[in-house]
């Protein structure tokens, strides 16, 4: 798909991002694992990473947003899906980020949101996790410090090119 699009349109091959909701988020994680040479950074909303054994050659920045009461893809995982924390731990370890996050909390329309930043990874990549307390399986409409989910995702992804954080 990337080859087809790039043959018909002028794209910046150093800034190819994958994002998705639910099953689309699983695809984004799969692309990060199996097409690591093409995908710059990924965003997962209410998704999970399946067990992967990709051939990773470079760090991949990840933003993950998930509700703690998601009844479709449980926050704590189950026999079908990895937990959010095990997914984050995979990328924290691979990207060599800090293991102790910077944590901020925020409330919007009665929903509490915890933001975890794991920074200082290889190539200056980071992992960001937005934990929506009592949030369900959704593309969240609540804002975090004035940014909705789409803005959070884009503002995270667009900070990176294939070589890491853009100066």
In which residue ranges do the predicted regions lie?
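Hydrolases whose catalytic domains are alpha/beta-hydrolase-1, hotdog thioesterase
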Residues: 27-31
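Conserved alpha/beta-hydrolase "acid-adjacent" motif
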Residues: 71-83
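Gly/Ser-rich "nucleophile elbow"/oxyanion-hole loop immediately N-terminal to the catalytic nucleophile
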Residues: 1-23, 33-34
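C-terminal catalytic histidine-bearing segment of alpha/beta-hydrolase fold enzymes
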Residues: 63-65, 81-82, 94-167
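Extracellular/periplasmic catalytic domains that process cell-envelope and extracellular macromolecules
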Residues: 10-12, 34-35, 54-58, 119-126, ...
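Active-site nucleophile loop of the alpha/beta-hydrolase fold
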Residues: 43-51, 67-70
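Acidic catalytic loop of the alpha/beta-hydrolase fold
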Residues: 70-73, 137-139
């Amino acid at each position: 798909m990337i080859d087809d699009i790039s043959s018909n349109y002028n794209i910046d091959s150093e800034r190819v991002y994958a994002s998705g909701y639910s099953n689309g988020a699983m695809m984004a994680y799969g692309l990060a694992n199996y097409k690591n040479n093409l995908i710059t950074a990924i965003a997962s909303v209410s998704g999970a990473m399946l067990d992967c054994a990709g051939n990773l050659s470079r760090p991949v920045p990840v933003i993950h947003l998930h509700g703690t009461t998601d009844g479709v893809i449980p926050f704590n995982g189950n026999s079908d899906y990895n937990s959010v924390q095990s997914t984050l731990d995979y990328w924290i370890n691979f990207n060599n980020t800090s293991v102790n996050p910077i944590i901020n909390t925020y409330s919007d329309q009665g929903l509490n949101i915890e933001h975890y930043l794991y920074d200082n990874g290889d190539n200056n990549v980071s992992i960001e996790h937005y934990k929506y307390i009592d949030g369900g399986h959704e593309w969240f409409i609540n804002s975090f410090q004035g940014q909705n989910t789409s803005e959070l995702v884009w503002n995270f992804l667009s900070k990176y090119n294939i070589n890491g954080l853009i100066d």
